[in-house]
Amino acid sequence: MSTPPSSLIFTVSRLNKTVRELLEGEMGQIWLTGEISNFSQPASGHWYFTLKDDRAQVRCAMFRNTNRRTTFAPRNGQQVLVRASLTLYEPRGDYQLIAESMQPAGDGLLQQQFEQLKQQLSDEGLFSQQFKQPLPSPARRVGVITSASGAALHDILQVLQRRDPSLPVVIYPTAVQGQEAPAQILRALEAANRRAECDVLIVGRGGGSLEDLASFNDERVARAIFASRLPVVSAVGHETDVTIADFVADLRAPTPSAAAELVSRNQLELLRQLQSQQQRLEMAMDYFLAQRQQRYSRLQHRLQQQHPQLRLARQHTALMTLRRRLDDGVQGQLRQAQRRHDYVRQRMVQQAPAARINRAQQRLQALRYQLSQGISLRVNRQNNAFVALCSRLEGMSPLKTLARGFSVTTDSHGAVVKQTRQLSAGDRLTTRLRDGWVESQVTEITRQPARRPRRSQD
């Protein structure tokens, strides 16, 4: 085997140097995307990390004077886009990248843009509660801005059909993903506000990645939602998905189905409420009627208690009680006199003097006659007084007056009508006659002028 010339034989150091020069000279600066791993930041301030994909990895370094210009904090697992120079570390023969700049890539970039726009709009006050419009209750017509072929529209219509089938729905079809989506959503919002045919709007779509939801993180869409004269309910993605549209909308719904729930009335619940109100009204009416019935019964009882016949009956009962007490008093006096008579007679019989007995008998007869005369006289007086009282009472009875051809007229309040100034045309009157009542209505009132005193003639 022949030996090559010494000029063609590489030492290790020469090889590594040659490779480094080739890499740096031929490759120059490149753009590289990958996932950060093994990230470290020692006290020197330099960054050391590895970029990898599913099949390979490469070491990277970013020096302190360069990484201080980076606008985010790198972390393991983050996708980044790096502008770097390729070089080789000669002592070990390891090649690596020297990063000159770094920015998030994929969802990382979108997340950074999301946070920046969120902070900007928040600083401008677009998220403030003072600008939130209340939702109409109930909504007369609902507008839906979403894809005409998406699952979100199907879910919204299904919920509205179940809860409130009579609620009209206007669909403003638009793309919800892709480069044209923000402009189409913008035009749909403008059309809905210009036509003003709805009183609330649902803006949304189904779930997806951060890139899929990018249209609802667009600044133009956010400002259009904020400027909408119609209340807007955002319904983007699933409950865990959060977009800029959620912050500027008047109300955020976690899902499209939930948005439909928020803007619609539950007819079954309304029916239950109506039935409950009807039941309460019926109970109130029953209570009111019961109160009125009790009041009527009390008034009727009081009226019956004041009836003239009842008053006469009570007075007659009182007179009979007095007469019975009078009779009892007379009988008591008679019994007492009889007992005294028997006692005296017994003593006289015991003493048996005939003369005294005769005188006593005569005196007794005289006393008995006087007592009988006195009792008769007193009974006659009491009876005459009773008859006189009955006659006076009967003469004062309103029924007696009615029997003589007179009548009593009362107004609708039960007050006795005595003068024409108590009445007005149209008043209802009740006239009591001897054998019944007459209901009438005042049609004309004629007042008799007062008579003037006659002047004396000189």
Swiss-Prot record:
Disulfide bonds: none annotated. InterPro entries: Exonuc_VII_L, Exonuc_VII_lsu_C, OB-fold_nuc-bd_dom. It is an enzyme of class 3 (hydrolase). GO terms for biological process: DNA catabolic process. Keywords: Cytoplasm, Exonuclease, Hydrolase, Nuclease. The keyword Hydrolase applies. Belongs to the XseA family. Heterooligomer composed of large and small subunits. Its EC number is 3.1.11.6. Bidirectionally degrades single-stranded DNA into large acid-insoluble oligonucleotides, which are then degraded further into small acid-soluble oligonucleotides. This is Exodeoxyribonuclease 7 large subunit. GO terms for cellular component: cytoplasm; exodeoxyribonuclease VII complex. One of its GO terms (molecular function) is nucleic acid binding. It comes from the Bacteria. It is found in: Cytoplasm. HAMAP family: Exonuc_7_L. It catalyses: Exonucleolytic cleavage in either 5'- to 3'- or 3'- to 5'-direction to yield nucleoside 5'-phosphates.
